[in-house]
């Protein structure tokens, strides 16, 4: 008798995706982050659901409702901090996942890569709207500053901003709609993850060498399920440690002050995971130029498959491009640091240099180094 997991219409899909999936035998721990992102998404949806049961999306009570969750709800403080720090873990895994994709040439699977970029944009939008919900000072002013950027769009900018706000400033209507979108988007993300996996399993996983691995594949279960479970334990341990020992480490103290439209914080900045993009935005003196640079800082990932000039897929055997890659990583860390600094000399200049270098590495240095390597290895 054939096993039910191979015949049942529903189990068959799960079996082909997580059990009998042919997987390259040499994929490293850098391939763990896909499953870790899945765990992060589940944690965020569950904790978010419990928070939504007690949260009120009204400007007069939003801040108090978050205080109420932390003080009066059973383990409310734990749920709240799991959700807030879970977002940070989500972005750490996300950045490593994208970084691994760039390093090992996974972007040559164009459909999977493009769905991934859309997912990245959607997750960033969700996180931004979630940051507005506690209605602290940084929530309010962050929402005001970031939504105001849309006013840089010619002709329709101001109308568009007022339409998003639901009035002439960030107010009750804005908070209510942000809560509605913040609630629904994770489920849309979950659906898009299915599409991402669908495209991935169409061609199969890449591997560290970047070579065709059809001759050497092993079933996903038990080999990679065990490997993923280890990663999940490490992730949960890190998250729990962060929540229990330093819950406010990655937050902003200004967000413990209720939102006040009459008092601007001395330094408005988003959460740490947006700082690199925020630094790129600030480094362009022109408003519209800054907005375009901000969007391009993520959208530039979509042109990677078209800038791909090497005969070798992975950077494993390409030391020159490896150098450019790690230069890019260092540059993103510098941008993250600059995004959290005040707008004054020398931070402005460092930000402008780092932003220019960011785009230059991706568009100019990496493709050129690939051509040089091909020439040196006589690959042409």
From Swiss-Prot:
A ubiquinone binds at residue 201. PROSITE patterns: CYTB_CTER, CYTB_NTER. InterPro entries: Cyt_b/b6_C (IPR005798), Cyt_b/b6_C_sf (IPR036150), Cyt_b/b6_N (IPR005797), Cytb/b6-like_sf (IPR027387), Cytochrome_b (IPR030689), Cytochrome_b_C_euk/bac (IPR048260), Cytochrome_b_N_euk/bac (IPR048259), Di-haem_cyt_TM (IPR016174). Heme b b566 binds at residues 97, 196. Heme b b562 binds at residues 83, 182. It is a multi-pass membrane protein. GO terms for molecular function: metal ion binding; ubiquinol-cytochrome-c reductase activity. GO terms for biological process: mitochondrial electron transport, ubiquinol to cytochrome c. The lineage of its organism: Eukaryota, Metazoa, Chordata, Craniata, Vertebrata. Gene3D superfamilies: Cytochrome Bc1 Complex, Chain C (1.20.810.10). Coiled coil: none annotated. Its main location: mitochondrion. It is found in: Mitochondrion inner membrane. The chain crosses the membrane at residues 33-53, 77-98, 113-133, 178-198, 226-246, 288-308, 320-340, 347-367. This is Cytochrome b. Its cofactor is heme b. Belongs to the cytochrome b family. Keywords: Electron transport, Heme, Iron, Membrane, Metal-binding, Mitochondrion, Mitochondrion inner membrane, Respiratory chain, Transmembrane, Transmembrane helix, Transport, Ubiquinone. Binds 2 heme b groups non-covalently. One of its GO terms (cellular component) is respiratory chain complex III. Heme 1 (or BL or b562) is low-potential and absorbs at about 562 nm, and heme 2 (or BH or b566) is high-potential and absorbs at about 566 nm. It comes from Steatomys parvus.
């Amino acid at each position: 008798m054939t096993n039910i997991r191979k015949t049942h219409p529903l189990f068959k899909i799960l079996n082909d995706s997580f059990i009998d999936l042919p997987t390259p035998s040499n994929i490293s721990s850098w391939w763990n982050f896909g499953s870790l992102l899945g765990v992060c998404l589940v944690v965020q949806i569950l904790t978010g659901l419990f928070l939504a049961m007690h949260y009120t999306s009204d400007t007069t009570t939003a801040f108090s409702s978050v205080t109420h969750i932390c003080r009066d709800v059973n383990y409310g403080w734990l749920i709240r901090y799991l959700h807030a720090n879970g977002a940070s873990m989500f972005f750490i895994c996300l950045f490593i996942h994208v970084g691994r994709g760039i390093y090992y040439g996974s972007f040559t699977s164009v459909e999977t890569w493009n769905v991934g970029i859309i997912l990245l944009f959607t997750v960033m939008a969700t996180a931004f709207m979630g940051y507005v919900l506690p209605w602290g000072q940084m929530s309010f002013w962050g929402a005001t500053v970031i939504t105001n950027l849309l006013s840089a769009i010619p002709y329709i900018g101001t109308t568009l901003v007022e339409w998003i706000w639901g009035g002439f400033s960030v107010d009750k209507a804005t908070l209510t709609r942000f809560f509605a979108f913040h609630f629904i988007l994770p489920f849309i993300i979950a659906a898009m993850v299915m599409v991402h996996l669908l495209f991935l399993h169409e061609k199969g996983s890449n591997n560290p060498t970047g070579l065709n691995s059809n001759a050497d594949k092993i079933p996903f279960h038990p080999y990679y399920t065990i490997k993923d479970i280890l990663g999940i334990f490490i992730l949960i341990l890190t998250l729990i440690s962060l929540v229990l020992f330093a819950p406010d480490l990655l937050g902003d103290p200004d967000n413990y002050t209720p939102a006040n439209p009459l008092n601007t914080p001395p330094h408005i900045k988003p959460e740490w995971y947006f700082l690199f993009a925020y630094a790129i935005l600030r480094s362009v003196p022109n408003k519209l130029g800054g907005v375009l640079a901000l969007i391009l800082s993520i959208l530039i990932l979509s042109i990677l498959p078209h800038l791909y000039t090497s005969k070798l897929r992975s950077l494993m055997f390409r030391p020159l491009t490896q150098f450019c890659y790690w230069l890019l990583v260092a540059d993103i860390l510098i941008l993250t640091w600059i995004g959290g600094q005040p707008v004054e000399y020398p931070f402005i200049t460092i930000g402008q240099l780092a932003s220019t270098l960011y785009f230059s590495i991706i568009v100019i240095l990496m493709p050129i180094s690939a051509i040089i390597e091909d020439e040196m290895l006589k690959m042409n």
